[in-house]
């Protein structure tokens, strides 16, 4: 594949702008298309507002960061994280490109029209069959997701052989964020058939993100390391979160052998598969995922976007839930915003709510977002101080609702098929006396 000097970015068929890559400086130059700038669709309202963004713009502070890779946050959100990025790296290796030769623009061209959200990138890399809707098999994808990290030579040989199972995982696994293996699927509830969710599927299919149960990670013992049964745990957390008023997309478990894969309906797609523009908090406000930020900063993003009180209360409920339920994976890419075709922004449903606490963990020993200048050892006074500062009403009532829901952990977990040893370990860590 030849070097890509310039790529174009599209939204709903309209040219948004163009971008080039400066290898020496390590960051991209971006420019809005004049016609799009007059459209009033503020796709990046905080960092590149249309009214104030003219000519070529770049963000040198984003250079060589894992979160942004030298790109504007608007564009960086379309890059896959560890799992999807590793898939793309292996595909490029077979095209003769080593990892240090692959630019972020190359990766965006590989993603093409298959990014999360609604942005599309041209020219798109040609991958045989990747844009076709065909049936896929979860068991095969699970085994392959393991080989990507454990048996690289075997995985590359399958790519060379143009193995159908490799094509399947390239179809479904290269766009989603996060470090752990997942797939973008289309699912037929009547037949249980699973197809690639990266392209338009036939009638009767809906669009989901599937997280592989951790059975392929047999060397991992900590709950935070994605053991078999993690799907059941996340499903129980979904049940507890929605029970205390947190808005989430529909979630399910997909049984497959001894595993239960966690599925969540995509909120960046309409029921008919139309795309919705999406930005994470990291992308929309350039809040680097790998740098400590605060819930107060997130509330500031909601305020700058002009969101309503209901959205502020939603964020407050999520904050309280994350504290009580020990979800320390509360970084800035785990909160998102949606823009409709009129340019109106809203707070996206909650996602990635799961137990994530390890006292010895580098990232999970403390919360990624601070509140009231603390990252752990919170008191009710800390939660109430945040509520007072941002104007949340009935904060004590919200805290009690969350406590009541999370206190049901043993019963909810058992109903959701969580293993007894996981029920016990998580139960001991929950903060139920705040």
Predicted feature descriptions by range:
Residues 1-332, 336-434:
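Phosphate/dinucleotide-binding and metal-coordinating scaffold of catalytic cores
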């Amino acid at each position: 594949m030849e070097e890509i000097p310039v790529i174009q970015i599209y939204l709903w068929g309209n040219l948004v702008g163009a971008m080039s890559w400066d290898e020496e400086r390590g960051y991209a130059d971006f420019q809005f298309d004049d016609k799009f700038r007059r459209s009033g669709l503020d796709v990046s309202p905080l960092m590149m507002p249309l009214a104030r963004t003219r000519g070529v713009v770049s963000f040198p502070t984003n250079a060589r960061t894992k979160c942004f890779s030298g790109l504007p946050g608007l564009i960086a959100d379309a890059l896959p994280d560890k799992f999807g990025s590793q898939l793309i790296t292996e595909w490029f290796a077979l095209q003769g490109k080593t990892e240090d030769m692959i630019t972020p623009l190359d990766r965006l061209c590989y993603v093409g029209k298959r990014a999360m959200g609604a942005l599309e990138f041209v020219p798109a890399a040609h991958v045989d069959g990747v844009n076709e809707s065909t049936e896929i098999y979860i068991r095969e994808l699970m085994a392959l997701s393991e080989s990507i990290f454990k048996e690289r030579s075997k995985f590359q040989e399958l790519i060379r052989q143009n193995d159908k199972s490799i094509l399947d995982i390239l179809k479904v696994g290269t766009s989603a964020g996060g470090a752990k293996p997942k797939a973008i699927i289309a699912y037929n509830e009547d037949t249980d058939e699973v197809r690639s969710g990266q392209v338009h599927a036939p009638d009767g299919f809906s669009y989901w993100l599937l997280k592989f149960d951790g059975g392929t990670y047999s060397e991992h013992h900590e709950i935070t390391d994605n053991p078999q049964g993690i799907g059941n745990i996340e499903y129980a957390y979904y049940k507890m979160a929605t029970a205390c008023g947190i808005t989430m997309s529909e979630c399910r478990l997909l049984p497959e052998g001894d595993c239960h894969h966690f599925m969540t309906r995509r909120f960046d797609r309409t029921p008919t598969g139309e795309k919705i523009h999406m930005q994470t908090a990291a992308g929309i406000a350039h809040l680097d995922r790998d740098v400590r930020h605060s819930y107060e900063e997130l509330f500031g993003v909601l305020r700058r976007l002009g969101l309503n009180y209901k959205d502020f209360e939603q964020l407050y409920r999520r904050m309280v839930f994350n504290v009580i339920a020990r979800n320390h994976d509360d970084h800035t890419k785990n909160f998102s915003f949606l823009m409709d075709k009129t340019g109106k922004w809203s707070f996206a449903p909650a996602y990635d709510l799961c137990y994530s606490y390890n006292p010895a963990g580098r990232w999970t020993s403390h919360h990624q977002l601070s509140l009231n200048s603390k990252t752990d050892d919170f008191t009710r006074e800390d939660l109430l101080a945040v509520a007072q500062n941002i104007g949340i009403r009935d904060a004590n009532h919200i805290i009690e609702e969350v406590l009541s829901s999370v206190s049901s952990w043993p019963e909810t977990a058992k109903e959701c098929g969580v293993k007894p040893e996981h029920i016990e370990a998580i139960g001991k860590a929950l903060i139920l006396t705040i």
